[in-house]
A protein has these predicted regions:
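Bacterial N-terminal signal peptides
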Residues: 1-6
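Structured catalytic-domain cores with a bias toward divalent-metal coordination
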Residues: 7-558
Length: 558
C-alpha cells in the first residue's frame, strides 16, 4: 500500500548551496555510500529546510523498513489525481534495486536536492518526478567490503548486497512479484501510472570506454515505449551526454568475448551484445505495460565519484528530454492504452503480440570504445574490480564491430477477446490484479467459441533459479466450443494492459505465469492447459448456449 504523503511548505528563505544537506559520498570524499539511516536523515533534512517536496513510503521491506519516495513538481502535487490533472509526463526514477550498485541512490538524492532548491526554471515546471532512492533497503544494510560484495566494482569501501533480505533478485521479480518490494512498486505503477520508468544500476562486465551504458525496453512486445525510447530518446541523450556533460555513453552490452554463447553465430569473435529481453527485468516489463522503460548502467570500473556524476548527469538529461517531448510522450502512452480497447470488438484492429524472441542475426556495425587490459605477471597486485594478474592501462581505442542491441520475434500470438481461468485459480487472478489488470468473474456457466491448448511436452529446468524450476510448454491450440463453469475468471484483452495480459497468460510465453510455476499443479502431458482463449465476449458470442445467454460477468471484489 502506498504510504501517506507529507508535504513540506514552501522554503521561507533563499538557500545557498552551503546550506544544502550533503549525501554520504559528498561528506566522505566518495569513500563511503549511504546507509539506510543516512538516506532517511538526508530526506529529513530536506523536509526541515522546507524543500518544496512531498514525502512518502511505497511500502515496507520484508524486514519492516519503509521504502521512501519523494515527489517533486511545480506546482507541488501529492496524489496521483493531482498529478494527472497537470497533464504532464510522470517520471519514476528508482535507485538501489541491487544494493551493491550504489551510485543511483546517492546521485538521485543529490539531484532531488538541487532541483528542489533551485530558484530558476527547471524540469519540475514541466514534469512530475517520483524518486525512489533506496528501493532495496534491506540489501543496502548488509554492508561488507567491496572486495566481498562487489568484486568487479571500483569502490566504495563498503557496499550492500545484490538480493533483498529474502535472497531474491528484485530485478528478476517483476513477473512473479514475490518480494514485498516488487508488490509495492507495482502498486505505485498502478496508482501513478508513470509515463517513464528509469532504473539505475552499475555494470558488472567488460572493460569499455563509456561512463554509462543504457537500454530501452528490449522486448519486441514493447511496441510503443521500447521503439520510441530506442529511436527518439536515447540517441539524443547520447549526444547530449557528450556535448553537455562530457560523458561518453553507449547502448548497454558487453563484448562477445566476455560472454561466450551470447550470440548464435559462433564464427563472430568480436562484437557487442546486449542483455535479456524478458519482462522479469523491470525496464523490459515496463515497456510491455505500454510505457517507456530506460535502464541506466554506470561503469563499475570508474571511481565512485565519477559513477555518481555520470548517473546524476544521465538522469538530469532524461528529465530534461522528457520535459521537452512531454506532449509526444503523453500522446504515445494514450495510444498504447487505447489500441487494445478495440480487441475483441474489431478483429481488424488486433495486433500480434510477441511472446518469444531471439537476438537479431543482422546487427548494426558501429564504432565501440575498448580499453586495453594488460597482463601484469604479478597475481599479488590488484586493482579494485580488476582480476588478479591484470591491470588497466588507461589506453582506449575505437574498434568497428557488430552491435547486437535488439531482438526479433520467434513466436507471436493474436490476442483473443479474453482468457478464461478455472474458478480455483484465485492466486493467478490475484497476481493479475497486482499487475494492474482487470479480472472479471462469470456468475453462471456458459459456452463460447474459442480454443484450448493441448500440452505435448513439459520442459522443466533442472536447476533452480530464484527458488523456481522454470517451466516451458510445447503444444497446440485447438478451436471448438468451450464450456466454461460458473465463477470462471475472465480476463479481457480489451484493456490498457492488453499486451501484458497476453504475455503473462500464453502457455508458450518465455516469461509468463507458466514459467514461474503458477499452473504446475494443473499441467499434464496430453492434458489441457488450464487457461482457455475466447474469441467473442458479447452476448452473441455466448449464444451457442441458450440456457446461459443471459449470463453476465461481475467484477471480483476479493
Amino acid at each position: 500500500m502506498v504510504g501517506l504523503v507529507a508535504c513540506a511548505p514552501p522554503t521561507p528563505r533563499r538557500l545557498t548551496p552551503a546550506d544544502y544537506p550533503r549525501t554520504r559520498p559528498e561528506l566522505t570524499r566518495y569513500r563511503e555510500t549511504s546507509h539506510y539511516a543516512d538516506v532517511r536523515k538526508f530526506l529529513d533534512s530536506l523536509r526541515a529546510l522546507r524543500a518544496p517536496l512531498a514525502f512518502g513510503s511505497i511500502g515496507k521491506t520484508s524486514e519492516g523498513r519503509d521504502i521512501p519516495y519523494v515527489i517533486a513538481s511545480r506546482p507541488l502535487v501529492s496524489t496521483a489525481s493531482e498529478a494527472k490533472q497537470l497533464g504532464r509526463p510522470i517520471v519514476y526514477v528508482q535507485g538501489n534495486i541491487h544494493a551493491g550498485e550504489v551510485e543511483g541512490k546517492d546521485a538521485l538524492l543529490a539531484l532531488i536536492r538541487d532541483l528542489a532548491f533551485s530558484s530558476k526554471p527547471n524540469v519540475l515546471d514541466s514534469i512530475v518526478l517520483i524518486a525512489v532512492p533506496i528501493y532495496n533497503a534491506d540489501g543496502n544494510e548488509r554492508f561488507a567490503p567491496q572486495s566481498v560484495n562487489r568484486t568487479e566494482q571500483n569502490g566504495p569501501e563498503q557496499v550492500g548486497v545484490r538480493p533483498n533480505a529474502q535472497n531474491l533478485d528484485l530485478n528478476r521479480d517483476y513477473v512473479k512479484a514475490e518480494a514485498p518490494e516488487t508488490r509495492a512498486s507495482l502498486t505505485m505503477f498502478n496508482t501513478w501510472d508513470p509515463d517513464v520508468f528509469v532504473d539505475l544500476h552499475t555494470t558488472d562486465g567488460s572493460f569499455h570506454g563509456y561512463a554509462l551504458t543504457y537500454s530501452p525496453s528490449l522486448s519486441p512486445a514493447a511496441v510503443f515505449g521500447g521503439v520510441y525510447a530506442r529511436d527518439s530518446l536515447l540517441p539524443v541523450l547520447r549526444e547530449r551526454m557528450r556535448t553537455r556533460d562530457s560523458f561518453e555513453v553507449f547502448d548497454y552490452g558487453n563484448f562477445i568475448s566476455d560472454q561466450p554463447g551470447a550470440i548464435a553465430d559462433t564464427s563472430v569473435h568480436e562484437g557487442w551484445a546486449t542483455y535479456d529481453p524478458r519482462p522479469r527485468f523491470g525496464t523490459n516489463y515496463y515497456g510491455i505495460r505500454g510505457r517507456i522503460g530506460i535502464l541506466s548502467e554506470a561503469y563499475s570500473h570508474d571511481s565512485l565519484a565519477r559513477r555518481v556524476a555520470s548517473t546524476y548527469a544521465f538522469v538530469k538529461e532524461v528529465l530534461s528530454l522528457v520535459a521537452e517531448k512531454g506532449a509526444a510522450i503523453k500522446s504515445l502512452t494514450a495510444r498504447a492504452d487505447s489500441q487494445p480497447l478495440a480487441w475483441g470488438r474489431s478483429p481488424d484492429s488486433v495486433q500480434m503480440v510477441t511472446i518469444r524472441s531471439e537476438l537479431i542475426t543482422t546487427p548494426r556495425v558501429m564504432d565501440v570504445i575498448k580499453e586495453d587490459i594488460e597482463k601484469t605477471g604479478d597475481s599479488s597486485l590488484t586493482q579494485p574490480g580488476v582480476p588478479r594478474g591484470e591491470g588497466r592501462t588507461g589506453r582506449f581505442r575505437t574498434v568497428r564491430m557488430p552491435v547486437y542491441d535488439r531482438f526479433t520475434s520467434t513466436l507471436d500470438r493474436t490476442p483473443p477477446a479474453a482468457y478464461v481461468l478455472a474458478p480455483g485459480d484465485t492466486a493467478v487472478a490475484t497476481l493479475l490484479r497486482l499487475h494492474g489488470i482487470r479480472v472479471d468473474r462469470s456468475d453462471s456457466a456458459w459456452r463460447a467459441r474459442g480454443e484450448s491448448f493441448t500440452i505435448d511436452s513439459i520442459i522443466t529446468a533442472s536447476r533452480t533459479f530464484q527458488g523456481h524450476h522454470e517451466v516451458r510448454l510445447k503444444g497446440r491450440w485447438e478451436r471448438g466450443l468451450q464450456t466454461l463453469p460458473s465463477k470462471s475468471f475472465i480476463v479481457s484483452t480489451a484493456q490498457p494492459r492488453g499486451e501484458l495480459v497476453v504475455y503473462l497468460l500464453e502457455p508458450e510465453s518465455d516469461d509468463g505465469f507458466t514459467t514461474w510455476n503458477l499452473f504446475d499443479g494443473e499441467l499434464k502431458k496430453g492434458g489441457q492447459f488450464p487457461v482457455t482463449r475466447i474469441f467473442d465476449l458479447s452476448r452473441r458470442g455466448r449464444a451457442a448456449n441458450r440456457r446461459s445467454s443471459a449470463s453476465t460477468t461481475q467484477l471480483l471484489q476479493n
